[in-house]
Amino acid sequence: MRVVFMGTPDFSVPVLEALVAAGHEIAAVYCQPPRPAGRGKKDRPTPVHARALDLGLEVRHPVSLKGAEAQADFAALGADVAVVVAYGLILPQAVLDAPRHGCLNIHASLLPRWRGAAPIHRAIMAGDEATGICIMQMEAGLDTGPVLLRSRTPIRAEETTGALHDRLSAMGADLIVEALARLPELTPEPQPEDGVTYAAKIDKAEARVDWTRPAVAIDRQIRGLSPFPGAWTEIAGERVKLLASRLDEGQGTPGEVLDDALTIACGTGAISLIRLQRAGKAAQDADIFLRGWPVPKGTRL
């Protein structure tokens, strides 16, 4: 098939690679424009942009698709289908209608649960037991289109957003290749009206840990916000990111360090901190962290 690919971050890269490996003709790659990054604040291409150039593909990065010229340029590609995954721009109706088979979106949830910007984070933070990938026929609404294919996967007990992100990206790549191969036989299924939830964009204000909350909720918060933006607490007045944790046993005053291995009392129950990161430093497993900065039993976070 002649495919227009539309995606921007790391999550999208395996999908582009899978489409190329499957023999599809990539008419063009659309992604967000390069943006300043790093200490020098030099413009840096997005992950999809960089990989597309490696693959010898044409890259386009318009700041908007609302204008008639941008829409005409898109339509002129004569695509059979557009594959959209974490692109970052709203697609006007003229763009949605241009490819012969429309635009297919790869969404990282079991729709209609977790429509919106942060479905992976929200699934973990809510304590969902499973999530998945949906291949959706795009329409004007936010993740409201009918679903062509879906694949379900359990969320593992200590899984972080980062780890689940990588698993779902690989699943999405496999599922879109299957969807394109079976496109003539697939019947889009409208999403049910019941069970709709919205995955709001993560606000950094959600990242500070309140140790008076139950251990289960704090563990979900830490795993759901890892690696970005990273849940955090203060140790001896210094902000420290908490990147991995597990539920543990123990009781004490909320925020109290219960042993020499960073088991922390919560409002109910306790958690063990597994991986931490000081400001300006690399992330470390708890045992290595404690060698450089012992946190005595009885310390209050």
Curated annotation (Swiss-Prot):
Record's keyword terms, sorted: Protein biosynthesis, Transferase
Q: Name one GO molecular function term.
A: methionyl-tRNA formyltransferase activity
SUPFAM superfamilies reported for this sequence: FMT C-terminal domain-like, Formyltransferase
InterPro entries from the UniProt entry = Fmt, Formyl_trans_C, Formyl_transf_N, Formyl_transf_N_sf, Formyl_transferase-like_C_sf, GART_AS, Met-tRNA-FMT_C, Met-tRNA-FMT_N
Give residues annotated as binding (6S)-5,6,7,8-tetrahydrofolate.
S109, L110, L111, P112
Q: Which PROSITE patterns match?
A: GART
What this protein catalyses is:
L-methionyl-tRNA(fMet) + (6R)-10-formyltetrahydrofolate = N-formyl-L-methionyl-tRNA(fMet) + (6S)-5,6,7,8-tetrahydrofolate + H(+)
Q: Name one GO cellular component term.
A: cytosol
- What Enzyme Commission number(s) appear in the record? 2.1.2.9
What is its biological role?
A: Attaches a formyl group to the free amino group of methionyl-tRNA(fMet). The formyl group appears to play a dual role in the initiator identity of N-formylmethionyl-tRNA by promoting its recognition by IF2 and preventing the misappropriation of this tRNA by the elongation apparatus.
Instruction: Report the sequence similarity comment from the record.
Output: Belongs to the Fmt family.
What is this protein's record name? Methionyl-tRNA formyltransferase
Which gene does this sequence derive from?
A: fmt
